[in-house]
């Protein structure tokens, strides 16, 4: 059995409902509904969720670990939420959050406007910092990757949009 799939999920103040091959996790920050693979059994025991494969096949074993991680992320998301921090490095690079839009000046001849999907918010504590928050880990990471994709850090000066914990290894310029 999967090592990840064996460990139970503590619900930490989240409500869980199992119905029709789907699990609904409800917490103070919102609600997430996730389809459950038919190769995985989910049992709710007094504040913990236990997952187990239906049979001993490799596929069911692998999916029990995957489903456990997805459900654990949903529980974490509705109780504490997820956030990803981005930093803008470069002269004149700045960001401004306006409602559900993120306006970016990244050295192009035009401003870049990124529309935030539902359930994801962007904040700009300073002009060169962006904090993307939401309850869905996959969505938060996807939006952060899209924003970074507008101007990824270049290897010679390091200018561009980078994750705050990202280390950009700079190359040396060509010598004559």
Swiss-Prot record:
Entry similarity comment: Belongs to the universal ribosomal protein uL6 family.
Physiological role: This protein binds to the 23S rRNA, and is important in its secondary structure. It is located near the subunit interface in the base of the L7/L12 stalk, and near the tRNA binding site of the peptidyltransferase center.
GO MF annotations in UniProt: rRNA binding; structural constituent of ribosome
Disulfide bonds listed in the record: none
Subunit structure: Part of the 50S ribosomal subunit.
Alphabetical list of InterPro entries matching this protein: Ribosomal_uL6-like (IPR000702), Ribosomal_uL6-like_a/b-dom_sf (IPR036789), Ribosomal_uL6_a/b-dom (IPR020040), Ribosomal_uL6_bac-type (IPR019906), Ribosomal_uL6_CS (IPR002358)
One Pfam entry name: Ribosomal_L6
Alphabetically ordered keywords of this record: Ribonucleoprotein, Ribosomal protein, RNA-binding, rRNA-binding
Listed PANTHER family: 60S/50S RIBOSOMAL PROTEIN L6/L9, LARGE RIBOSOMAL SUBUNIT PROTEIN UL6M
One CC-aspect GO term: cytosolic large ribosomal subunit
GO biological process, one term: cytoplasmic translation
Protein name, as recorded: Large ribosomal subunit protein uL6
């Amino acid at each position: 059995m999967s090592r990840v799939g064996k460990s139970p999920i503590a619900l930490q103040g989240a409500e869980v409902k199992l119905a029709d091959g789907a699990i609904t996790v409800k917490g103070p920050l919102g609600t997430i509904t996730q389809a459950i693979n038919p190769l995985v059994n989910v049992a709710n025991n007094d504040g913990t969720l236990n997952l187990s494969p239906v049979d001993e096949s490799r596929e069911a074993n692998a999916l029990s670990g995957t489903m456990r991680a997805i459900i654990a992320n949903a529980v974490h998301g509705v109780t504490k939420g997820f956030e990803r921090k981005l930093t803008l490095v470069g002269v004149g690079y700045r960001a401004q959050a306006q409602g559900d839009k993120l306006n970016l000046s990244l050295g192009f001849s035009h401003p870049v406007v990124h529309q935030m999907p539902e359930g994801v918010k962007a904040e700009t504590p300073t002009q060169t910092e962006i904090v993307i928050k939401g309850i869905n880990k996959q969505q938060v990471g996807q939006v952060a990757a899209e924003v970074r994709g507008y101007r990824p850090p270049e290897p010679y000066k390091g200018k561009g949009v980078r994750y705050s914990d990202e280390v950009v290894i700079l190359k040396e310029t060509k010598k004559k």
